Structure formats: C-alpha cells, structure tokens
C-alpha cells in the first residue's frame, strides 16, 4: 500500500494521518511535507522519525533535485532528476512521479529496496515527460520506446566507475 499525501492533511487531520501511516508500506511526500510531518529540518532525521511512525519505506520527492528513498534499516538511495533543457510546466510532475512509481511496483509485485530504486527511476522518468508540456498532455502520446530511452538516460547519468584503490 502506497500513500501519497500532502500538507493539507497534515494541517487538518494529523492524528488520522499518523494512524494511517501504521497501515501502509510506502509514504511518498515532498521535502517540505517531510519536514512538516517530522518537525525536523534534516531530511535524514525527518526520514528516521517518519519511518518510526509506521511505513516500511519513505520516498521524499525533491522536484528538479530528484528523490530520496529511505527504509527502516537506514538504507538510503538518491536518484537525481534528469537535467532537461526545456521545462514548460511542472504541474502534475509529482503526481506523474507517484503514478510511474506505483505502476512499476504494481506491475512487478516486488517491494524490495532494490526494486523501489527501480520504481523511483521509472517515476522520475514519467515526471520528466510531464514537465515538457502543460499539465499531463505529454503523457497522452508517450510510447514504451520513449519511456525505455528516458530510463536509459537516467542510467547513463548516474553510472560510473571509481576505483579508489588504484590511486596510491
């Protein structure tokens, strides 16, 4: 069970929201909502506090700066946002991220930490398409080939080799 909540519910139904957090697998919120819910400025401290409220995983969306994934074992994963030359409208990007993320998890049936990382990349890819036009209009004519190519762009962006042992 994935919950994508917002500050509105934190403002008017905080106790009910906290009760709900005990029943879910994944909470997705943005960085400001993480700070509001936890009372912590540091996102690492915020994540630890929120995870103690019940969810097994926490995804913190940071807009054009990517997303963070935390679990109750103190594992952390960071995925950058894809640098785009043309950004027309960020409206709906967070919802597209959540839809891509949840859709990937639902299609795989796997909620392991490693698969959550893949889901974050998939969600980030969907969000990157959304900002290319107004609203969610860009998603209407999207092909699987375009999605696969965008995901490969993410992989190319973050994949590198660093060998510290060779620097002696």
Residue ranges and their predicted role:
Residues 44-168:
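Conserved phosphate-binding/catalytic region of the ribokinase-like
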Residues 1-49, 56, 66:
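Conserved beta-alpha-beta core of the PfkB/ribokinase-like small-molecule kinase fold
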